[in-house]
Amino acid sequence: MMSTYKRATLDEEDLVDSLSEGEVYPNGLQVNFRNFRSSQRCWATRTQVEKRLIVLVALLAAGLVACLTALGIQYRTRTPPVCLSEACVSVTSSILNSMNPTVDPCQDFFSYACGGWIKANPVPDGHSRWGAFSNLWEHNQAIIKHLLENSTASVSEAERKAQVYYRACMNETRIEELRAKPLMELIEKLGGWNITGPWAKDNFQDTLQVVTAHYRTSPFFSVYVSADSKNSNRNVIHVDQSGLGLPSRDYYLNKTENEKVLNGYLNYMVQLGKLLGGGDENAIRAQMQQILDFETALANITIPQEKRRDEELIYHKVTAAELQTLAPAINWLPFLNTIFYPVEINESEPIVVYDKEYLEQVSTLINTTDKCLLNNYMIWNLVRKTSSFLDQRFQDADEKFMEVMYGTKKTCLPRWKFCVSDTENNLGFGLGPMFVKATFAEDSKNIASEIILEIKKAFEESLSTLKWMDEDTRKSAKEKADAIYNMIGYPNFIMDPKELDKVFNDYTAVPDLYFENAMRFFNFSWRVTAEQLRKAPNRDQWSMTPPMVNAYYSPTKNEIVFPAGILPAPFYTRSSPKALNFGGIGVVVGHELTHAFDDQGREYDKDGNLRPWWKNSSVEAFKQQTECMVEQYSNYSVNGEPVNGRHTLGENIADNGGLKAAYRAYQNWVKKNGAEETLPTLGLTNNQLFFLGFAQVWCSVRTPESSHEGLITDPHSPSRFRVIGSLSNSKEFSEHFQCPPGSPMNPRHKCEVW
């Protein structure tokens, strides 16, 4: 239908172009006029009949011309034909059900686009938030469940290990039989815990090494291997701040506002201490309060995330010897050689540290804290991470705390959902081939690649029109955009059984021993991390597994990654109008692409190296442009609590830039392919549909507790403001919805970076 409509339009234009001399009306009718003066005849010589006929003919002619003109204008400006296919009717129904058309789109587009969806979708039991991402993840979970529970002879060893892990998790009978025994034995093996029994008093360094490497906890600080930001072809050890049990330092420091959470956290700590064999509850509570006070001391020296956005300022490369001087409470060479064994670490080993002041202060804190408390704190980190692998009593304790922390209503979620999530989280690449074969069409990579190419072209077109950027920086920015590498669906190695098995060769899953399997995985994953230290970074090493409903940009690799899990509806559907696909996956692509040029990504060059490649004039101009967004988003609030416009700046830049690039790409597509059919009954143009599709991707609901947590931890703005903030900055949105200047969705002062 679309191509037929396009050909019809061209045919009509060809007809007009082929006409001969004379005035041409929009319908192609030619009317020739002879010279009036040379052919006129005196009115007085006409008979009455002639005069009456002439007047009548003149009136008829005038009426005919008026009718033809009106018909011509209507014909010329008619809307595209309506799509009445089953797919179009279905997507129209979904859109209508999500909308609240009684809301003025120029007043509150989020409520206009999502009001119906929000009314029909209260936060489900067992969840603290719900939206399009959640719905798609539930769909993916059901697929993974089926795949894990139905063995086939063709699966690889890695896939079989994922199935064994999942089935051990599902064996609740065995888990209930073991109760707390697996963790209690582990604590005893580590030298004990004063909360539940005697402990080894001179074991600080050994305990720290074991809980860091074998069990992937991060008390005091985190240690990991990643590409060196200033030499992206080389991996290097990183040391950074860490160690809080709650999601943000704000929970500890704003005690009045977060009193309910702090009390709930302490009660949770006490409950776990009791379940693990602690005796007197008052004694347990007293020691757990000391741990909480120690975490509060850590929170006091922890740097807020909004002050860590400029990596040029916080990046410091030191040697192991210099690190020893910086933070002497840890014997760094023995520590590093133990956790990275068999890799040898000497005093000249380069180490990247962020927030040198934090490491200095945490070293002082360790040296001035009682050894019993330090051990209690380290073991608490282990308990907090591993208790979910134990029996139902621990699950109940988790749920009770989650209700306080996130407002999650207590519910008996099916066990399989927990087990699918944990298996995917730990062995997602192992089960990846099953998921890809079941869900990912062969041509999906090509389709996604075409969309990325169109978005990238549109972004570069916008780049060429920026007035605040100098020409040299613009040229380098275009080179960086051209160099961005696309990773779609899955890393190639997972589809080769031999390569996949090689990756998981050193991991063994044991039937019916869930806790043991989880502990083995933590140890295995650290060994994989340690092995990367002397290897070059690898593009095939993804930070997200194939089923994940998400996407990301890697600055050191200068690549954008789109797992298979995010490519279905509502982000992309083959049968949907292009307006919806560009508003869905198109904006997602544009968002990740723009991250290469947000306040953090812009500091990396086309090769993924952190260096000052912008001219100072453009750096200053960029900062001025971004301050507008900081102020804009800081004026938004949820339940009276403001959005942190500084902390969310990078994501806000990406949201705005992604929307702009996707809209421009859609316009380019229409110019090339012709107008699409419209959807029935909506009364919307396809340009309006593009913006509506974008907004409905972000329809979501959250509990008040979850909203509070998001405001102080999430670098993304709340969904409502991801929609309102981006659209109110879009001139094209205001034009298509005819929003009056000065209305909420069309403010006179708009922010724009890219």
Curated annotation (Swiss-Prot):
Record has Transmembrane as a keyword: yes
GO CC annotation, single: plasma membrane
Phosphothreonine modification, residue list: 9
Cofactor remark: Binds 1 zinc ion per subunit.
UniProt topology in membrane: Single-pass type II membrane protein
Cytoplasmic side of membrane: 1-52
Extracellular-facing ranges: 74-754
MF-aspect GO terms: metal ion binding; metalloendopeptidase activity
Pfam family of the protein (one): Peptidase_M13_N
Disulfide links within the chain: 83-88, 106-739, 114-699, 169-419, 628-751
Transmembrane segments: 53-73
Major localisation: membrane
Described function: Converts big endothelin-1 to endothelin-1.
Subunit structure: Homodimer; disulfide-linked. Interacts with PPP1R16B. Interacts with TSPAN8; this interaction recruits the endothelin converting enzyme ECE1 to tetraspanin-enriched microdomains and positively modulates its enzymatic activity.
Protein name: Endothelin-converting enzyme 1
Protein source organism: Cavia porcellus
